[in-house]
A protein has these predicted regions:
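Small-residue-centered hinge/linker elements
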Residues: 1-116, 128-132, 136-211
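Glycine-rich beta-to-alpha transition loops that act as phosphate-gripper elements at the mouths
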Residues: 119-127
Length: 211
């Protein structure tokens, strides 16, 4: 077997035409005369659908990002190599719902249409949408100490002032005095997605998991 690595350039810095000339496969290890190729892809950062021009001029333009639109182009290049298998090395905290959904489908579609085994490995972080996308692979491997899981959706919090009796403003901001206290409602989908919420007691299972 021969292990090939796909070099992925800084996507914000190049147009799609320039990017095609820069991306290439490099020999990693194995028998370089073999036709049995295994491709290694490295993905790092949050998951977004495509690059935004606004990001290029922001303070975060050097942060690594997984762009699904560019990943799909990479898969087209990989298909030409006719690999026996693909290893995706990923570290991601998650991303937008639509981008994560598209990444999952891109991997799943490639795997089925090309009858290619896809294995996924993480060294440090595979959380939220990152783990969701990883479920499209045939098997997930994790290094010791890697943070895995935590899939869920959280919306904005709803603060309710129960029976307010005084509202005032000042140099320190607005203050509200209530007769029956303040209640906070969390919009979440999934168990314990409001972990460390100061407005509720932790469950016994949550404490045991953290310990």
């Amino acid at each position: 077997f021969i292990l090939l690595g796909l070099l992925i350039s800084n996507l914000e810095s190049f147009s799609s035409t320039e990017r095609t000339n820069i991306n290439k496969f490099i020999f990693k290890e194995g028998d370089n005369t073999s036709q049995n190729n295994i491709v290694l892809i490295e993905l790092r950062g949050p998951i977004l659908n495509k690059p935004s021009g606004a990001i290029e001029f922001s303070l975060i333009d050097n942060i690594e990002v997984i762009y699904v639109s560019e990943f799909v182009k990479d898969l087209e290049e990989i298909k030409l190599q006719n690999p026996k298998g693909i290893v995706i090395s990923i570290d991601s905290p998650g991303g937008s719902v639509s981008a994560t959904y598209n990444l999952y489908n891109a991997i799943e579609k490639f795997k089925i249409n090309n009858k290619t085994k896809i294995f996924l490995h993480t060294d440090e972080l595979l959380a939220s949408g990152g783990y969701w996308a990883a479920l499209s692979s045939d098997k997930i491997y994790a290094s010791y100490g890697a943070m895995i899981g935590s899939i869920g959706v959280r919306g904005p919090d709803w603060i309710y002032y129960d029976n307010p009796i005084s509202i005032s403003t000042g140099i320190l901001g607005q203050t509200i005095e209530t007769k029956d206290g303040i209640k906070k409602y969390n919009t979440i989908a999934g168990r314990s997605k409001d972990l460390f919420n100061s407005f509720r007691m932790p469950t016994k299972k949550e404490v045991e998991s953290l310990q």
